[in-house]
């Protein structure tokens, strides 16, 4: 089970280590982290002031497989680009921009299982967005939950009806905060059947 966390440096770098450590604990697998580069804002819609998450995931797949005819190194920092030579494992990008997809006004994150790529944005996960007092622990908790949720999709898991499960689909921040940082027994069994994760969890 190979998972790479691409942490765009426009998102506070100090959060990348605790997020990767908590993701690793939730998934019970090591997370490889790169956090010193900037990923292009693919699919930016000036009217909405958001990025199309589907286009971003497609670009991410092109980037990680290094297809020079489609993704030029000059699109981003060359040293950052060179650190991702032929990565074929599953990838989670953390980007600073607000995201949408064609059928939704916004998304906290999105996964593209066929490509093995996923993206999460902390844009609407911070307390400040809702006029609340800043709290890094809240933000870390939400990024981890949403990140683990999208990684679950990359391994073929569907949405779960258990409101406490990682795979429950949150409609808003309240739903996300209500979730726990674990997979329910059913989802855990499904995940373990697709990966090397142990089935015993709860």
At which residue positions do the language-model features occur?
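Propeptide-to-catalytic entry region of secreted or membrane-anchored zinc metalloproteases
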Residues: 1-104
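Generic, low-specificity signal for short hydrophobic/alpha-helical stretches with a mild N-terminal bias
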Residues: 5, 102, 133-134, 149, ...
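Sparse, context-dependent recognition of short Cys/His-centered cofactor- or disulfide-binding micro-motifs
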Residues: 16, 77, 105, 131, ...
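Activation segment
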Residues: 101, 155-156
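Metalloprotease/metallohydrolase-associated module, dominated by Zn2+-dependent proteases
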Residues: 107-142, 157-202
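Catalytic glutamate of the conserved HExxH
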Residues: 146-154
């Amino acid at each position: 089970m190979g998972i790479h966390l691409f942490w765009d440096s426009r998102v506070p770098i100090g959060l990348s280590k605790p997020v990767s450590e908590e993701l690793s604990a939730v998934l019970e697998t090591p997370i490889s982290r790169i956090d010193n580069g900037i990923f292009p804002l693919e699919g930016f819609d000036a009217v909405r002031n958001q990025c199309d998450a589907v286009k971003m995931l497609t670009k991410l797949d092109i980037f990680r497989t290094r297809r020079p005819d489609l993704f030029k190194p000059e699109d981003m920092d060359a040293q950052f680009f060179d650190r991702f030579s032929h990565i074929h494992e599953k990838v989670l990008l953390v980007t600073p921009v607000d995201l949408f997809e064609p059928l939704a006004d916004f998304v906290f994150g999105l996964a593209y299982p066929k490509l093995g790529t996923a993206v999460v944005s902390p844009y609407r996960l911070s307390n400040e967005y809702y006029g609340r007092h800043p709290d890094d622990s809240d933000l870390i908790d939400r990024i981890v939950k949403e990140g683990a949720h999208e990684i679950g999709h990359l391994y073929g898991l569907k949405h779960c009806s258990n409101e406490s499960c990682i795979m429950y689909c949150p409609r808003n921040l309240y739903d996300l905060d209500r979730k726990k940082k674990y997979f329910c027994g059913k989802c855990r069994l499904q995940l373990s059947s697709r990966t090397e994760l142990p089935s015993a969890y709860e």
